[in-house]
Amino acid sequence: MKYLLRNIIIILIVVAGVNIFTEKMSEKKKGEANPGTSEDAPTSSFITDATSFEAADEEDEELDADAYSSRDWTSLMAMPTDEQIYSVKGLGRSPYIALYMHFPGVRRAMEYCADFHADHQPKGTYLCPFNWWMDVSSLKEQYTSVYNDYTGTPGGYCGFQRLGDGSRVFIMTVWTTFCEDSDGNVTVFTPKVVYPENKGEANRTNAEGSFVQCILPYDWRAGRDYRVLIQQTNAADTGNVVLTSWVYDMTNHRWDELVSFDTGIRDIYMYSCGGFLENFLTEYTGEVRTMELSNMQARSADTGEWVAADYIQFTVNGSLTKLGYIGSCNFDTDGASLWAITSGVSGLCETPSDEEPYYLEEGVTGDPY
């Protein structure tokens, strides 16, 4: 009887311990799975470590037909043959499609959100959902000149690349801000990557002025859906604006915090958001690239409300670097989404006009978390 009682007590203790552990893990998963609003965003101390993500260098796995977009790409652009693709290898870059998202009534934003999908993402593909400027009005009250030495206006961008070795990465860049006073003295605000630690690299290339950039493995896959969120918060100790990128994998139902930048500046806000689809390796210029964006929303810094984009302004080959572009492209809006397709092979379709806005149907707005 004594031994039976002891065993019962042991079992009860074990069960209680398991229940407590399960509750703790449940709480942790809830925190990890949700970025929260910009007011109560969790700290990165319990978010999946971005450095643990694995890049894939193997060839794309064959996905089920229903994994891909229902869009008939062959009706939007003729598919190039292998011979055509080979014939333009190294001759230039396929068309650079940039886009501006208009959010009615949003003067300044604390968050941007969009869902993206790529059926075709060959090597040398850069799909950028967000490219934004910063409203630095507060600095202009203190200095006679506030600028960035590349675009003129401070800002940043983030997106997803397929590298030449086949690996897939996430990239986020924030430009350095220069402030000059009436005596000609220049104060420099250099952004810093605060998560993950020691991952930022300053001025990695000479092509885009002064900036800090973070590149991390992220295995974004063709035919899958993702949601990307750029969130602005204030550092608890300094009040500096912190810009954080999150990605939601809709296949695995998981939010991941990827990168956080401390801008070193207070009281600035994001505005004028856009994106682009780019081919950055001429060896793969003839390959087909596609991009689809939907659920494009901005959270107003003035009202706190989420607002859906109402039109898109496309631009063809408008890159500041003015590289040599060749080939075909097509783009349009469809309901509350947009799409674009490119190839370095010419004559596959007619290029649409980029002079007029492309309107979107009214999208669903609200908490994207």
Task: Describe each model-derived feature in a short phrase.
Residues I85, N252-T263, A309:
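Local beta-strand/beta-hairpin segments that build beta-sheet-rich folds
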Residues M1-I10:
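N-terminal Sec-pathway targeting helices
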